Amino acid sequence: MHDRNIIDIHNVEFKPFDRYGSPVPNMSWHIISYDQISGQGSYVLKMDPGAQTVPHTHMGFEEFFIVEGELIDSDGMVFKKGEFVSFEPGSQHSSFSEIGALIIVFQRGLNHPLEEH
């Protein structure tokens, strides 16, 4: 018997991205295996044009693959379609998408909004 979950990321139901308690404007997600208590797992994140992530600190690794679009990180670095990005534990940032983006996110630990620190 195989325990697996196969999804078509272009044909899933997205829900408002509410990871920090209330929905973040212009962002939605589809949880694949993400556990909101431990911060472990993966999800598909959709950022509409103009979306801005909440500035946050990584407690564990956060890695993502950009399927479509691009992100501009808080330090000005641009992440483009086809790139895989890895943030180490303790790193802090936020990202903005001018044109929108579809991203597969892999997290190994919770993120905390910067205002909590």
Roles of regions detected by a PLM:
Residues P89-P113:
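Ligand-binding loop in jelly-roll beta-barrel domains
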Residues S28-H58, E88-Q92:
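Conserved short histidine dyad/triad with adjacent acidic residue
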Residues P49, H58-S74:
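Glycine- and acidic-residue-biased ligand/ion/polar-headgroup-sensing regions
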Residues D73-H93:
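Short acidic-glycine-tyrosine-enriched beta hairpin
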